[in-house]
Amino acid sequence: MTLLGLSACSVNARIKKADRKYAIGEYYEAGEMYRQTYRRISNKNKDLRAHVAFMQGECNRIINGSKAIGAYKNAIKNHYPDSIVYLSYAQVLHYQGEYKEAIKQYDIYLEAHPNDYVAQAGKYGCLQVEQWKHHSSRYKIALAKEFNEKRTSNFAPAFISEDGD
């Protein structure tokens, strides 16, 4: 019984410490602390697991980490009470190039908040990318090897006048 009480105190103390790291902007460290804490929380405590998973996702989203996808999935799986989790998850999917899944998550969020401009713009952006993929332009982008040669002495091309100025 005492061991269970110490374990719960340890988890709560770790969450508070991670919250302090998050508050001062140390997102990487806070994300790692949330990740380690998430593993220690019992599967029966869904509310706490959802909160910790969401905070881990927020930390990873802020530092542009792809780990945010898994964290947001865990928060949704554990029934995080705020619908903002769907918007954040959609944004991370959008950044990672998973546009179809991002559109689904934007739609879920827009059911609860139909007038949210950020979600509408995100969904529109995903739809535009899908459309652009099917209707590509005639322009081709190619690597300019002559500017990236290691053995050339031209570090950066420059224009000079006839006087040498």
Residue positions per predicted region:
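Bacterial Sec signal peptide processing site at the extreme N-terminus
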Residues: S7-Y27, I41
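Short, conserved micro-motifs composed of acidic
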Residues: I24, V85-S88, Y95, Y99, ...
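Alpha-solenoid helical repeat scaffolds
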Residues: I15-K16, D47-M55, I84-S88, K104, ...
